Design a protein with these regions (language model features):
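Positively charged n-region of N-terminal signal peptides that target proteins for export
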Residues: 1-4
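Short, contiguous alpha-helical
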Residues: 32-43, 51-92, 131-176
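Acidic/histidine-rich alpha-helical segments that form the ligand environment
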Residues: 96-131, 138-154
Length: 176
């Protein structure tokens, strides 16, 4: 009886597993998940940095925190446009001297654009050749990979700036 129950349970699980089928647009779907995580962490980091620390830079040769934020804004608007094959938004260019409130709003808008653009993305165009940067041709898939790695790199940098100022980054804060 016990053996019959186990065989029945396993066969039911196998039927369920095979009924799932392959995921639709696994690359685009995965990129959307990564973007959502990046959005929460990066916006949280930008909001956590005090306004008077936006001019902070760890060494003379490194960029300020505000410069990092400006870079993130431009990166998001450009790379999500390329990855999803949608036009980049027409926005006022952010500047390092902009206020914290203005930079927070712009980084939020850049992630909103990414969410919207990636919502329209599917895997069918990943092999298309695109002008990635500076006339360099690459498959659209490269833009998706650069987006994912860039988001990780940018958040890691923002987290370091926070820690150097005694602030715990969002991803390291205990969730209750």
């Amino acid at each position: 009886m016990k053996r019959t129950l186990i065989v029945f349970a396993l066969s039911g699980f196998a039927t369920f597993a095979f009924a799932q089928g392959p995921a639709k647009d696994p690359v685009a779907s995965s990129l959307r998940q990564l973007e959502q995580r990046s959005q929460g962490n990066t916006i949280g980091a930008v909001e956590a940095m005090p306004a008077d620390k936006f001019s902070y830079k760890p060494t003379a040769d490194q960029m300020t925190f505000a410069h990092l934020v400006v870079h993130i804004i431009g990166f998001n608007n450009s790379i999500c446009s390329k990855a999803a094959d949608v036009p980049a938004p027409k926005v006022e260019e952010s500047k390092e001297a902009d206020s914290k409130d203005k930079l927070v709003a712009a980084v939020k808008a850049s992630y909103d654009f990414c969410s919207e653009a990636l919502g329209k993305m599917d895997d069918s165009k990943l092999g298309d050749s695109i002008d990635l940067f500076g006339g360099h041709q690459a498959p659209r898939a490269m833009a998706a990979l650069i987006a994912a790695s860039g988001w990780s790199d940018h958040y890691a940098a923002a987290a370091q700036y926070l820690r150097l100022n005694g602030i715990t980054p969002p991803s390291a804060q205990q969730k209750h």
